[in-house]
Amino acid sequence: MTKLVEIEGIGEKYASKLEGADIKNLEALLQKGSTKKGRKELEDASGISGKLLLRWINMADLFRVKGIGEQYSDLLEAAGVDTVPELAQRKPENLHGKMVEVNEAKNLVRATPSLSAVEKWVAEAKELPRVVTY
């Protein structure tokens, strides 16, 4: 079970609000927040905006791809990829180049992932079933 605070932006305050809505980990957040109805229920129960919840749910979805954790999900988001279906549509070479460019400008991670890692992410994203509906 992955802790809520693994997602950028979910600090102790928001984690506490989510736990009050019976969301104890990222897997529960992804499961409950995968539908519009579930996100609305979460918004009502936690008092957290739907937009912010969706951002976190998309990041939790990216965590399903092996090798993408807190740091790389932030870098992917900064490079314009914030969902698994979006990752699946990307050309690995172009995405890798964009990630290097973004990281040089923003210094989000110590080491950018290798091209082979990005290729594996894109391939895995193509195989993963869609979980989040919009």
Model region roles, listed by residue range:
Residues 1-134:
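C-terminal extensions
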